[in-house]
Curated annotation (Swiss-Prot):
Keywords: Acyltransferase, Amino-acid biosynthesis, Cytoplasm, Methionine biosynthesis, Transferase. The lineage of its organism: Bacteria, Bacillati, Actinomycetota, Actinomycetes, Mycobacteriales. Homodimer. This is Homoserine O-acetyltransferase. It comes from Corynebacterium glutamicum (strain ATCC 13032 / DSM 20300 / JCM 1318 / BCRC 11384 / CCUG 27702 / LMG 3730 / NBRC 12168 / NCIMB 10025 / NRRL B-2784 / 534). It holds the Pfam family Abhydrolase_1. Transfers an acetyl group from acetyl-CoA to L-homoserine, forming acetyl-L-homoserine. Substrate binds at R213, D342.
Length: 377
């Protein structure tokens, strides 16, 4: 029986050295995680563990950012499942990353290796191995977490019972790489960046990180939603239409983006942001597997795919591509929302229905045979 973190509390697990697919080594790595629900195994020895994968700037406390979905009696039912959410390797919320201390007593900084989505999954596999968990009932994740979920199904089919892949693609598109590289450049152009070795300077590249967040946040929201909320309105008591442009005289949407930037700067590390954004740029399920469609067809883990109809960052046609080529499509669903990419986090009613049906499909309730999933292709 694995010794797990107390329910709802952050715990750190040592996983040893992590070798990246590009040939680097992250020595003495640690993974931070949260756990909810009791661990059990069935008579075949398969566990009731559900592994949740967070998005780019998320963390392991899924009960916070998916509060409407995770808990006793909820869609991700902790009365039934042992739910585990890790902080990704390279992150800044407890797992080893650029802002962590290297074994030599100094910060990792820019010595921290570049990582891929596959490296992130391999680190999580080492984490499960360290806990003594050999199987999981399901893996669920959206955005960068969806990319990890898809790679889990491709890399470790003997471990994963089923997967729910949300709001992501089979590989990074040129547009995604471009918009994400612009965010990286904003941080690297901050004079406090110091090539990633700023941790001992006492000055963080906050301006660059804030600029990156402004760019990113526009891709997380729907164009129509942003326009309907703000239009061309001026921020209260400010005048962006004066005779000279002044930075403190803003449109309302500028104030909103400033607010989002300030929030992220207070809680996230720029080094981790660059590292994880670069990992998203490297995402390609087909690399060294014969191309996208061949790689998807080879995935035999049952996979539910869901996307958002107004997603700018990962347009819905990318989830349609997944659904048409996966080797074992469990179901396909569309989240209908003006919100855009973030709808998998904010549209709780639709997500509740999708996730409940996902678990009903992988663990049918004999007392409720009418379980179904809605298809929107």
């Amino acid at each position: 029986m694995p010794t797990l973190a107390p329910s709802g509390q952050l715990e750190i697990q040592a996983i040893g050295d992590v070798s990246t697919e590009a040939g680097a080594i992250i020595t003495n790595a640690e993974i931070a995680y949260h756990r909810w629900g009791e661990y059990r195994v069935d008579k075949e020895g398969r566990s009731n563990v559900v592994l949740i994968e967070h998005a780019l700037t998320g963390d392991s406390n899924a009960a916070d950012w998916w509060a409407d979905l995770l808990g006793p009696g909820k869609a991700i039912n902790t009365d039934i499942y042992c739910v585990i959410c890790t902080n990704v390797i390279g992150g800044c919320n407890g797992s080893t990353g650029p802002g962590s201390m290297h074994p030599d007593g100094n910060f990792w900084g820019n010595r921290f290796p570049a990582t891929s989505i596959r490296d992130q999954v391999n680190a999580e596999k080492q984490f499960l191995d360290a806990l003594g968990i050999t199987t999981v009932a399901a893996v669920l994740g959206g955005s960068m977490g969806g990319a990890r979920t898809l790679e889990w199904a491709a890399m470790y089919p003997e471990t994963v019972g089923a997967a729910a892949v949300l709001a992501v693609s089979a590989r990074a598109s040129a547009w995604q790489i471009g918009i994400q590289s612009a965010q990286i450049k904003a941080i690297e152009n901050d004079h406090h960046w110091h090539e990633g070795n700023y941790y001992e300077s006492g000055c963080n590249p906050a301006t660059g990180l804030g600029a990156a967040r402004r760019i990113a946040h526009l891709t997380y929201r729907g164009e129509l939603e942003i326009d309907e909320r703000f239009g061309t309105k001026a921020q209260k008591n400010e005048n962006p239409l004066g005779p000279y442009r002044k930075p403190d005289q803003r449109f309302a949407v500028e104030s909103y983006l400033d607010y989002q930037a300030d929030k992220l700067v207070q809680r996230f590390d720029a080094g981790s942001y660059v590292l994880l954004t670069d990992a998203l740029n490297r995402h390609d399920i087909g690399r060294d597997r014969g191309g996208l469609n061949k790689a998807l067809e080879s995935i035999k883990v049952p996979v539910l795919v869901a996307g958002v109809d107004t997603d700018i960052l990962y347009p819905y046609h990318q989830q349609e591509h997944l659904s048409r080529n996966l080797g074992n499509l469990l179901a396909m669903a569309k989240i209908v929302s003006p919100v855009g990419h973030d709808a998998f986090l904010t549209e709780s009613r639709q997500m509740d229905r999708i996730v409940r049906n996902f678990f009903s499909l992988i663990s049918p309730d004999e007392d409720n045979p009418s379980t179904y999933i809605e298809f929107y292709i």
